Amino acid sequence: AIAVCDSYMRRALMADSLVWVSSAPRTVASLPYISERTRSEFSYYLSQVDEIIDTGPYPTHEIIRHFRFISAVTGATIPPEAPQITWRDQAPPIDAGAPYVVLNPGSNEPGRRWPLAGYAALAKTMRERGFRVVFVGRVEERSGHEEIEQAILDAGETQGIIDMTGKTNLPELLDLMKHASLVVSNDTGPAHLSIALGRPTVVIVGGGHFGSFVPYPQEVTPANTRFVFQEMECYHCFWRCHRRANKFQIFPCIGAIAEDQVLRACDSLLKGDEERRAEELYFLENLMAQISEADPIGPARVEMRMTEGELRPIEFK
């Protein structure tokens, strides 16, 4: 048996202490981020493990760190991969209807919440384009429910808006995101889950420890993922922001992200989806025209199936 601790940004009492009390025959830990405040406790716990693995300097991304750690422990070179989740194919917990976009305006850290007015404006734009809009979040975030409603009302759009804040468990949230045309989220757990599900995802990112968790490195960023940020000279503050008056204010690096930045990121993902649907329709219309010319007696019927992302005929009747 082996006990491991491979997180870089960690707390000794919540991570290293567990390895210590496990009494495993072999213990391995990565070299963590150490500040002057945490140096003494980390020094003690690190002195108790059998092996320490240095996964790289700050701000090496956690995905890269995990693969370096696994490679060192196993003795094999394991190249980093984009996160992936295989999830059930179950209908989302909303009524069937038009395609929908999922918006996640919450976050455990109030300062990382992009302004609700921005989400409301985005919801209005998505509705104008024919998408339904589904708001999600934890039950603890229902305190902002009225504010969300008012922001949507101020944007002049209520039809096709579905508020699922506090109404889903984790599996249902995954069901919702798996079938979404797009997911837009603050830098929080559901954003990473959406990316791992393979859904088109836009993540609104601040600079507290930029590059450690988000954005993902290019080599492990899926083609249908966008990270939106507005770089500032105070990046890498570790969220100890000196520019806000209290802990409930939005971090300036989050507030500085413009609505059109987020919309452009959404467009870059939706455009590809819309173009694909248009090409499929064009292909189908031309195919049916050719069939009709070949069979003037009556309209032919063709069964279609998605194959490798393309609509193809499989049987003529």
Language model: regions and residue ranges:
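Catalytic machinery of carbohydrate-active enzymes
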Residues: A1-K317
